[in-house]
């Protein structure tokens, strides 16, 4: 009889639902019967909306499952559910409310309700004190907007929803406003709403009175794009000589100290130009989409000055302001005195504040303002009464500020800082060397003669531009080399070098690389011809070449090679090497938009750990280690234990009278005496030290 009871369709809704989906026309009467029952249950529910109604939940899910089969009868069904939720969502039972929301989600998935109407309702429901419901609605909102924009951007729906979210961010309910902000941030990160309007709506959240909303908005602007590619050290094979080519030339040439030094210098210059050639990676594209960064930064600074939030939130404010000022090159002169108040060695998170001070400087900051920041850092950090780490951090910060704003450095201060090159602390001396290296490329004339190093063509041309001066060129620097190359092509070519050379037999690719050793001589000859030309003649020739012909990739390659040679070749009349000049530094000039904390905190020599730190490291290493012996791995992990292992775990009383134990050779009494005497002598020697 139980099998026959399952066929009673009016009471067995799952079976009826299955049959309707297979053949809607045959079960139209049964469906209408359930629909009338649903209408009567709704009227009963409206009388007592605070009480759960199991029949209503079952019928609502049944109608949602079969709605696509009888759309003509269920035109008002989505609107009925929407009105129920709008009217009674505050008093409704949580399970009942969740069921109605799931039914609406099901109707939306079947495209039986417009997205804008449903999403506006769901944003209203975010005010409910129901964590599970809010999580479900958040997931659906993000997924639905993603599906709407899957094939193409639906600007009409996007505009409506963005306007609605703008009002939600100003809602009195903090939870609803926070989830609305989270939705926009998630859609931006998924590249669905990655337009300027979304970013500028999020900027309004940076001035929220609710700390959670404020922090979420600040983190959005301070974060990094997930799809941002990391800088790779891979070299381009067709962009001039690679490091591999240089190594081949050295390995196939004469091995002596002179060639080794030339190789090291060439590798450094190549590495530096690779960094310059690399495209700039924007830290976060959202900062570039802000409509009025000047006003935004001014409002943030005003909020920061009056803020009573935790110190971490204040740091986030300072970080965002410094990024806005540095990236957009804003004039926010009140920010620098505010930061200077925190530039003390004992200040909490002072390295981050130094980083923000460096980030906020750019070439348009007036020298008197940037010089005051530099003097504050020098007076508070770079003094002999501070530790070596503090002095190193200060010099690193000064270096980063001057790299972005060279006019901040005065000649007197630079000469004082350069004297730390011979400081007893390795970290301080290496930081000072890095600063000297920076000014060798910016303006060597500011350095004392003994710190300038061997002059090159590039350093001879280097100079710091005056405040507000534009360096607009009407020619391509280095283009003068093209005509020299054109003349050389008319001469007969001679192949004096080896045709090919390989790195080694166990090379990764197993390929042969053609290396013409005569190319070095050709480049040297070409460089000598250019060096012999006066500067005015070089510029005139470069302008003529730039304006008279279209340059090919091959031409640009030759120009890059010539610019590389400028940094390697000695200046005219300076071929003799001076002593105590060469200052080697691994620090390269950084040209990115943002700095990293490592640029400020970088120590060349790791400081010694104290006893507490070493002990903490030892104890941390012991937490995961169960045994103090190396565990022998078995060939087969599922194999049983050996007899030797079983003996170790066997009870001693079972082993006491075994033949192995009784026949075991033990130490004699005399051996024990000698061992005791030796140990006592060793202990006495240790105590006498």
From Swiss-Prot:
Subcellular location, in the record's words? Nucleus, Nucleolus
Note down the stretches annotated as region Disordered. Answer: 227-260, 485-512, 623-689
State the GO CC annotations.
nucleolus
| GO biological process entries | protein transport; ribosomal large subunit biogenesis; ribosomal large subunit export from nucleus
**Keywords for the protein's UniProt record, in alphabetical order:** Coiled coil, Nucleus, Protein transport, Ribosome biogenesis, Transport
- The keyword Transport is assigned to this record: yes
Q: Write out the biased-composition intervals (Basic and acidic residues).
A: 670-681
* Coiled-coil boundaries: 258-319
**Highest taxon listed in the record's lineage:** Eukaryota
Annotated Acidic residues bias: 492-512
Q: Tell me, in a sentence or two, what this protein's role is.
A: Required for 60S pre-ribosomal subunits export to the cytoplasm.
Q: Which family does it belong to?
A: Belongs to the SDA1 family.
Return the protein name.
Protein SDA1 homolog
